[in-house]
A protein has these predicted regions:
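Contiguous beta-strand/loop segments that form the cofactor/metal-binding neighborhood of enzyme cores
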Residues: 2-4, 203-276
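Conserved SAM-binding strand-loop segment of SAM-dependent methyltransferases
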Residues: 71-78
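Residues forming the Rossmann-fold NAD(P)(H) cofactor-binding site
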Residues: 30, 100, 199
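N-terminal Rossmann-like dinucleotide-binding module
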Residues: 1-69
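Predominantly a Rossmann-like dinucleotide-binding segment in NAD(P)-dependent oxidoreductases
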Residues: 146-220
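Beta-strand-loop-alpha-helix segment that lines the small-molecule cofactor/substrate pocket
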Residues: 89, 95-96, 100-147
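Short, conserved SAM-binding/catalytic segment
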Residues: 65-71, 129-133
Length: 276
């Protein structure tokens, strides 16, 4: 178990920082490492965050990563890193198909987890992961950054102000053209536009009008155009809520879009120019 869990007062009194480890050493791991280093150097965060360890399947790659960013420890085994009692929080930075298995491994080893989006490849995996988090009493959450931006509060305030009237429909679209990437087209890696960028469109809808506001989904209809490999290149999901509100999310890796979100009420509408 992380030495910090249940000991917040003690940690603050003794100056014990959160030791963060990164599982994986790919491009998104580099982005997180850069952020962690900046936080550790920033007086607003330096008293509680410490970039501690990285693990990759190739020990040499992990060592090079640790040297580049100044991490204390490098592991050539994910399991060995998860077994390190100095690790408080593990950021899972591998392809989607590995997220559930690796997060569950870390939770069972006593580590809190921050899982890169998409959280898991499917709902069954998400339920299994969250069940283990509940059993262990540890944190398991998704690293979907739009949920933590100030714009979320602004949107909530607007929706609840009544200025738009009763919200009747929402549309969200996020598409980036990207070709020749195995992680996008390979079904074995849980590829596809939905898990790669579509989660942002669905997340926008949920934040703007969905479960965060007490609504329940009454019906879901989805359609997609696949790559030759079978995973979705472009997709659209239509959500009907219990109060009749209709929401549409579209995402693609085959084309580009304006990345906008539109919230429509019977008194007016609001446009978010970039939901990501």
């Amino acid at each position: 178990m992380s030495m910090l869990n249940g000991r917040r007062d003690e940690a603050e009194r003794t100056g014990r920082k959160v030791n963060v480890a990164i599982l994986g050493a790919g491009s998104i791991a580099n982005t997180m490492a850069t952020t962690l280093v900046k936080m550790a150097e920033d007086s607003r965060y330096s008293s509680w965050i410490h970039p501690y360890a990285v693990a990759a399947r190739d020990k040499g790659r992990a060592e090079a990563f640790a040297a580049k960013y100044g991490f204390d420890t490098a592991y050539g085994s994910y399991a060995d890193m998860a077994a390190d009692d100095n690790v408080d929080l593990v950021y899972i930075a591998t392809p989607h198909n590995f997220h559930a298995e690796q997060a569950i491994m870390c939770l069972k080893a006593g580590r809190n987890v921050l899982v890169e989006k998409a959280f898991t490849a499917n709902a069954a995996q998400a339920r299994a992961l969250l069940n283990v988090a509940e059993e262990t009493g540890l944190l398991a959450t998704e690293a979907i950054w739009t949920r933590y931006q100030p714009s979320r509060d602004l949107i909530n305030e607007l929706v609840h102000s009544g200025e738009l009237g009763t919200i009747r429909s929402v549309r969200a679209e996020l598409s980036y053209e990207l070709h020749g990437r195995d992680r996008i087209t390979n079904p074995d890696l849980a590829g596809g536009a939905l898990l790669d960028v579509g989660v942002y469109a669905l997340n926008f809808i949920d934040m703007a009008v969905g479960a965060d506001h007490g609504r329940s989904i009454a019906d879901i209809v989805t359609t997609m155009v696949p790559y030759s490999t079978g995973v979705d290149a472009t997709n659209t999901t239509v959500l009907t809520y219990d109060d009749g509100l209709l929401a549409t999310a579209t995402s693609s890796r085959a084309v580009a879009s304006d990345r906008s979100g539109v919230i429509c009420g019977d008194n007016g509408y609001a446009v978010v120019t970039n939901i990501n």
